[in-house]
Amino acid sequence: MDAQTWPVGFRCLLLLALVGSARSEGVQTCEEVRKLFQWRLLGAVRGLPDSPRAGPDLQVCISKKPTCCTRKMEERYQIAARQDMQQFLQTSSSTLKFLISRNAAAFQETLETLIKQAENYTSILFCSTYRNMALEAAASVQEFFTDVGLYLFGADVNPEEFVNRFFDSLFPLVYNHLINPGVTDSSLEYSECIRMARRDVSPFGNIPQRVMGQMGRSLLPSRTFLQALNLGIEVINTTDYLHFSKECSRALLKMQYCPHCQGLALTKPCMGYCLNVMRGCLAHMAELNPHWHAYIRSLEELSDAMHGTYDIGHVLLNFHLLVNDAVLQAHLNGQKLLEQVNRICGRPVRTPTQSPRCSFDQSKEKHGMKTTTRNSEETLANRRKEFINSLRLYRSFYGGLADQLCANELAAADGLPCWNGEDIVKSYTQRVVGNGIKAQSGNPEVKVKGIDPVINQIIDKLKHVVQLLQGRSPKPDKWELLQLGSGGGMVEQVSGDCDDEDGCGGSGSGEVKRTLKITDWMPDDMNFSDVKQIHQTDTGSTLDTTGAGCAVATESMTFTLISVVMLLPGIW
């Protein structure tokens, strides 16, 4: 035997000798037990036995041999055993909880950035192309994107209503500045009449319906995805602090602290013994496993479907193009709309007015024309893919939790002497049961009774969110429009195939990075050269300036409401 292996072998022989001595003669002093009791802050050592004695009043740590425990110590040990169990659960779930919570925060932050960027693009459209109506349109643009954010983050707002509200407010501006320009009626009553007439005269054609369809395909899945992540955090928080039954508490005490009473504080339980105790204590939690598995699978399916026309970045960052198309369509049908408005609202009392124009800040030209996330290395779709790849590792988390705790934390290694609940033995000889409530009928260590109502509530929530996730996942071969209230429009069906250009690839590392590349198809400089542009001259006539581009940028609108909206899990 060489110099390196001798100490290891010697220690093993010494341990076996000590174990044999403890089994045959019992512990001679309680000094080490007293020290550990004090070190764990379980109570004062005053009154604790100095040497082993009979323990007739013990309820769980019963032994024929003299003991270092009193009834008071046993009660303190039982509290410590429950606390240890909760600590083990929290430690085991901490990585999973961190994965979900950090990614939920990153997704929310990225969506907020998308919304602000889309709002900025729409503001730039008005300031560069429809300057005379830009300041009047600012409030409607801000309100629209605030509503988008509120809806995404769980507020009770109706997408159909805020889309209609935006186009209702846009029509009076288009009418006064493009259809009947130059001199306008300044009365609120006449503008309100024009606003109310929008849905009757349809100045923007089917574009409002197209916007509703796009919002339905992109906003609702993203909203549901965020809410589902929030529920995942709630499930983990709940299971981290489960109440353990009396039978479980007694079994934990017997497994972890009864060896202390015999002076065997460093002895670990046998693997089979540990599995029986932990599988019994966590039997109800194991019932979550199939529902947790379905939850992760449904998240994956929804994530895979959220690309192409279902990609929220594509929809939001192209919203300004649909607004421009809507204004152009109304301008092209100006004469017809003029007659319809005159018929509905009458002819206005015409008074000369001067519309306020945008105030430009040349120093901020580049600031507004570039996306703030252009230097990022990944798309939002890739982030979802990486997150799901990491989350897949936890599909059987609740089904294998008892085994994980015994293997990683609690049980003795194979081949070492271990505690079987009564004494130090070479191996555990009782039957080892499986996971789940049904398997516990033959558990020799823990009696499992009834059904845990808290676990049942979690199961019901998981079932419900799985239904929501599956309901928001378009079919891969034939996607259907998600209904929004009573509205919505006809949309084309598109393929659900996912390729690299869709941004569906991912490394699967799950590492959280604070900056996200929102799109890989937006130019570095937002360019309006392809946008049909109509500028109003000082004389009231209109001038086509297609290709002129946007010379300056405006500050993005403030978005304070979204920052304070929390995810709302209470929809279930």
UniProtKB/Swiss-Prot annotation:
Transmembrane domains' residue ranges: none
Carbohydrate attachment residues: 120, 237, 441, 486, 495, 507, 509, 527
Record's keyword annotation contains Cell membrane: yes
GO terms, biological process: cell migration; positive regulation of canonical Wnt signaling pathway; regulation of protein localization to membrane
Gene name of the record: GPC5
Lineage, top ranks: Eukaryota, Metazoa, Chordata, Craniata, Vertebrata
Keywords: Cell membrane, Glycoprotein, GPI-anchor, Heparan sulfate, Lipoprotein, Membrane, Proteoglycan, Secreted, Signal
Secretion signal span: 1-24
Family according to the record: Belongs to the glypican family.
Membrane topology listed for this record: Lipid-anchor; GPI-anchor
Tissues/organs with expression: In adult, primarily expressed in the brain. Also detected in fetal brain, lung and liver.
GO terms for cellular component: cell surface; extracellular region; Golgi lumen; lysosomal lumen; membrane; plasma membrane; side of membrane
Localization, UniProt: Cell membrane
Function: Cell surface proteoglycan that bears heparan sulfate.
InterPro entries tied to this protein: Glypican (IPR001863), Glypican_CS (IPR019803)
Entry keyword annotation includes Ribosomal protein: no
Positions of region (Disordered): 355-375
Protein name in UniProt: Glypican-5
